[in-house]
């Protein structure tokens, strides 16, 4: 396990959980309700029955494994800070709302964020601690 005791796993880590090195994850890991929402949408966004089944299995596993951190008022306020960091870096936030809401959930709960897409979140270094896995 990583030296970090607690952390929030973003959706990419949950999707790729089977291939992620467990030693790079925190001992106590959580997910955001936003991740659960993204996973819930997943089975409905593919026409391939085998892929739909895999996505449904991943959703059920995540729902049974994690108690999601809510997207509450603290996370909503933290989202403003996250968007400010995105804009300060010259990037646009519109197409990445779900990722940024997950990051805001990490900020609101004072947790580092673990992701498979660190380049997408590199500009948030002053707002949230990002760990690549």
Predicted feature residues:
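PIN-domain endoribonuclease scaffold, especially VapC-family toxins
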Residues: 2-8, 17-104, 122-132
